């Protein structure tokens, strides 16, 4: 059997109407993931691919994360088509945080929009370290090299403020509608000497499997199976789960021995990051652990925070956030109400540099360093130590109001 290709999750980010869906649609078409007859006639034929839902067709807005798949020579990709509309930013949080790399789409005729900046900062906050920039709608600006270079310079300055090196980031002039420089070099841009989008996708670094980090396995469900015993189920974020190993569940505070591991009805000796497993634990009862607990080895158990410092971005809050505010934090499989103990420093959202000490409140668009106290102990890790376990979304009133990461645990269990 041929070795399976490495899998890569790809987020498409950028301002609404800059052509993300059209670009994804054309990419899928050119890479043979969809048949031509599936496409509508005329202007919006490629966007159809991503907008399968009726309501979306009417509004001409991409809502859902369309998990479309395509392959290149090197990778198999799942496209997380991240919506650009304001009220769909929460999708971007669940979407972008699953992504190994992002394609930022910027329209040549519009240039940098507020959302362009926001998405760059947000994707960085969510741990995306590989970026490709597609300067789209080149057909609208008559394939102007000057326009391309001007935007490339502006975008280079912008991405360097959040820690991307412009020299490491490919800038590609494309037309999502006409298909220029997507899978084949375009004769409309003879001045462009770089690679096509597909070549740059193939040149991305393989996603690291964080096997060298300590084991962290957030629990999704717990079953009790007759004749077997307690079987927690979850997806390994970091490290390796092995049979006969002693593991600790936090914040439950119980330990047990791994007797067996199963994935897709197949028995395994060990399981790696990305694997969805069920495993039988001796010495732990079904009611001792629950969704939101995290398993680690007894030598290096998960960190339980009673208080932590975080960097957050306020995405959409109808009012202001002040000290004492207690929304629900969603981290891995846990959902815990947490209180803002202090607002420490307001940051410039474009650069991450300090702007104001101890602000009175935070509002939509603000970035800040804050101190957080969970209302009950929860597992969260320092982003620098175990990045996969350090991110969270903050939800309130049925919407995602902020996203962030834990930068220090100041009081642990």
Swiss-Prot record:
Q: Which CDD domains match?
A: EF1_alpha_II, EF1_alpha_III
Q: Top EC class per UniProt?
A: hydrolase
What positions does the entry give for GTP binding? 14-21, 81-85, 136-139
Give the span(s) annotated as G1.
14-21
The molecule here is called Elongation factor 1-alpha
Looking up HAMAP family in the UniProt record yields: EF_Tu_A
* Compartments it resides in: Cytoplasm
Under the heading SUPFAM superfamilies, the entry gives: EF-Tu/eEF-1alpha/eIF2-gamma C-terminal domain, P-loop containing nucleoside triphosphate hydrolases, Translation proteins
| GN (gene name) | tuf
Residue ranges of the region described as G4: 136-139
Chain residue ranges for the region called G2: 60-64
MF annotations from Gene Ontology: GTP binding; GTPase activity; translation elongation factor activity
Q: Which organism is it from?
A: Methanosphaera stadtmanae (strain ATCC 43021 / DSM 3091 / JCM 11832 / MCB-3)
Q: Which InterPro entries match?
A: EFTu-like_2, G_TR_CS, GTP-eEF1A_C, P-loop_NTPase, Small_GTP-bd, T_Tr_GTP-bd_dom, TRAFAC_GTPase_members, Transl_B-barrel_sf
- Gene Ontology CC annotation, any one: cytoplasm
